[in-house]
UniProtKB/Swiss-Prot annotation:
Pfam families: AIF-1. Homodimer (Potential). Monomer. One of its GO terms (molecular function) is actin filament binding. InterPro entries: AIF-1_EF_pair, AIF1/AIF1L, EF-hand-dom_pair, EF_hand_dom. The lineage of its organism: Eukaryota, Metazoa, Chordata, Craniata, Vertebrata. The modification Phosphoserine is found at S2, S134. Residues 47-82, 83-117 form the EF-hand domain. Ca(2+) binds at D60, N62, E64, E66. This is Allograft inflammatory factor 1-like. Residues 129-150 are annotated as: Disordered. The keyword Phosphoprotein applies. Coiled coil: none annotated. The modification N-acetylserine is found at S2.
Length: 150
């Protein structure tokens, strides 16, 4: 049992191989988008697809090629916009068209390149700006008295 368990959660070489395999799969999907006539007029498509692939791999926590509810929750918290369980379910439903409980890479790229207004798309676009504009305070919090509390 401990041998099975250690193989499932092993890092190092096995994790590197897993990530390399995932990257090849996503690169193959990117090639499909590059060959698709529907996206031929998209500006800077190769650069965008590369950026989308990196973000997707960062938030695909279980390395199964899908962003599930917990991965989305972590992504939103990391971006500084935590959402409720219900809001995240609605986001996933909007991105997948209500077909799935997880966001596949194809759904993710379609959402990012599509004309639909998705909350997730806006968050991903402005991720860098939001993090730069609100630096986290350092040191202990300032002292407050009871009169200053709401």
């Amino acid at each position: 049992m401990s041998g099975e368990l250690s193989n499932r959660f092993q890092g190092g070489k096995a994790f590197g191989l897993l990530k390399a395999r995932q990257e090849r799969r996503l690169a193959e999907i990117n090639r499909e988008f590059l060959c698709d006539q529907k996206y031929s007029d998209e500006e800077n498509l190769p650069e965008k697809l590369t950026a989308f692939k990196e973000k997707y791999m960062e938030f695909d926590l279980n390395n199964e090629g899908e962003i599930d509810l917990m991965s989305l929750k972590r992504m939103m918290e990391k971006l500084g916009v935590p959402k409720t369980h219900l809001e995240m379910k609605k986001m996933i439903s909007e991105v997948t068209g209500g077909v799935s409980d997880t966001i596949s890479y194809r759904d993710f790229v379609n959402m990012m390149l599509g004309k639909r207004s998705a909350v997730l798309k806006l968050v991903m676009m402005f991720e860098g700006k939001a993090n730069e504009s609100s630096p986290k305070p350092v040191g202990p919090p300032p002292e407050r008295d009871i009169a200053s509390l709401p």
